[in-house]
Amino acid sequence: LTLDTPAAAVVPEIGAKGVLAGFDEAGQPILRQAKRPITLRHLLTHTSGYAYDMWSADIARYRKATGTPAVGTGRNAALDLPLLFDPGEDWSYGIGIDWVGKMIEAVSGETLSAHLSRVLFDPLGMVDTSFKLRPDQRARLAGMHGRGPDGALAPIAFETPQDPEFHGGGGGLYGTARDYLAFARMILNGGKHGGLRLLKAETVAEMARDQLGPLAVRPMRSSVPSATNDADFFPGMPNGWGLTFLINRKPSPQGRSAGALAWAGLGNTFYWIDHGRGTAGIFLSQILPFFDAKAISLFRDFETMVNAP
């Protein structure tokens, strides 16, 4: 795989729907051909044009009009979506990483689960990270909770499909804080884990480089309130994207260095990796919708305390 080779050379079905240009009077989608092919770099930087329906009213409308299943179903048809814009022309957080998972499977000849275990989880000692729950993991599984209109939390049923048609590169792993911190420390240490080197230092440097150029990460506006609130990690601040991390272009109010790496998971799980300060932090909860005000406040307070003089 190379970053700028057309992805269709590996997964021919990618981008087949073209770009969503609007809807006709009957509410059916109007599609056009994209101006250029999607590359791996587009997918990793969320500039491919793909979007999640929870942050795109147009994709949510398309999915409803066409009967396309949700990504969370684990069905291959869920990835058969149009683009919001021509590749490379804007930023939208979406299913591009799921397509990267498909590319990895195509070139490795392994399932995504087997490949990640071999090259990442096993070398890092991430013994509790997997797509499918073992019985001993299920016994320790933290339940998901929903935040109601009154602010109270209540248990809700939530589980990713255990035998899906595809494992999502963009989500679906179970794990622990200890496991994920092993990954974060490896990135913080320039690709090394103890005496083992998993990634070249120059690879990590490229991963940590802002790839967006004149583009920028924009606030994510919710179109599915049950899944996510509006999300803006650094209000009023410019942000970029690496391979594949959120990058704050200026120092944050929490003391995070400019150029640090971060991202999150749907259940209000958050992390940062700050090469400037030499720190990394993990915050895990199991709450929906995403970007819960109390959870993000606790995460910010946690980072502020870590960075305090």
Which sequence ranges carry the predicted segments?
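Residue-level recognition of short loop/turn positions
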Residues: D150, G276-R277
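Generic C-terminus detector
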Residues: I287-P309
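Short, hydrophobic/aromatic-rich segments at coil-to-beta transitions
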Residues: Q254-A262
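Short, surface-exposed loop or secondary-structure junction motifs
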Residues: P6-P253
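Short helix-loop-beta-strand segments that form the rim/entrance of peptidase-like active sites
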Residues: L3
